[in-house]
Regions:
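Helix-rich, well-folded core regions that mediate interactions or catalysis
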Residues: 1-246
Length: 246
């Protein structure tokens, strides 16, 4: 490809277009990372990009969850090179969706989700043999739900934006899409193993309910830091500081 300063020669300006998903996209963009004020003036542009993405990818269209992928990408590319941020963001979206589409709970990939659920179970049991309870049929739908609730967005829907950026840094540094996907799976395994006692000692329904309540907190407080420890041990994360109220 040549040196980075020549990459702009390979880009082609994107021609925006509309799709049948405009209404849903508009709603989703307005409620994505609502606490992040940086995005507020950019939301119309994000709507336009998702709309264009859906119209170009006719067979895929727009699936809820894509909104969480495009926000962090847009911020990174816009702050890096605003002149080509649209093109770079949509190109990155295309690449991510090629990797993640099968994890979306659309129905056509139900067999793949079950297979991936089996992989998750096996990885968990390898680390903690007592987690063999996850192989019970009662947990099959739960494992599918765990995958489809976090993997399609690479955890962006259950993390604070700054933690999304930290986690994605570790995922994107993998050498290939396969390795990147495997790191995302490892992140899910870390989350499940961290709560192993729920599955080992509690009834199925109770375990699933408690786990669902703790997912966001555990990802924010433990799993992101653990992923950095494993994938980038040279990185040291500063603890978040809180400002005392007057």
């Amino acid at each position: 490809m040549g040196p980075p300063e020549t990459w702009s020669d390979l880009r082609t300006p994107v021609v925006t277009s509309t799709s049948a998903y405009l209404g849903q996209i508009t709603l989703d963009v307005q409620r994505t990372f609502p606490e992040e004020k940086w995005f507020d003036p950019h939301r119309p542009q994000l709507v336009q990009m998702l709309n264009t993405f859906a119209s170009v990818n006719v067979g895929m269209g727009y699936i809820q969850g894509m909104n969480y992928l495009i926000f962090p990408l847009w911020k990174v590319f816009y702050q890096s090179d605003p002149g080509w941020a649209v093109e770079d963001t949509l190109c990155a979206m295309q690449s991510l969706m090629h990797m993640l589409l099968r994890t979306y709970p659309t129905g056509m990939f139900s067999t793949y989700l079950k297979t991936l659920g089996g992989v998750l179970r096996l990885r968990c049991v390898t680390l903690c043999p007592k987690m063999h309870v996850l192989f019970d049929s009662d947990y099959e739908e739960f494992m599918t739900a765990v995958i489809s609730s976090a993997m399609p967005t690479l955890f962006a829907n259950v993390l604070k934006l700054n933690h999304v950026m930290l986690l994605w840094d570790q995922l994107f540094e993998a050498g290939s899409k396969r390795q990147m996907f495997n790191r995302a799976v490892d992140t899910l395994v870390c989350l499940l193993v961290h709560h192993k006692n729920l599955f080992i000692y509690l009834p199925v329904v109770t375990a699933m309910e408690v786990f669902s309540r703790l997912v966001r907190q555990t990802l924010d407080s433990y799993v992101v830091a653990k992923s950095i420890e494993v994938f980038a041990p040279h990185v040291r994360v500063r603890p978040e500081t809180t400002t005392a109220s007057a």
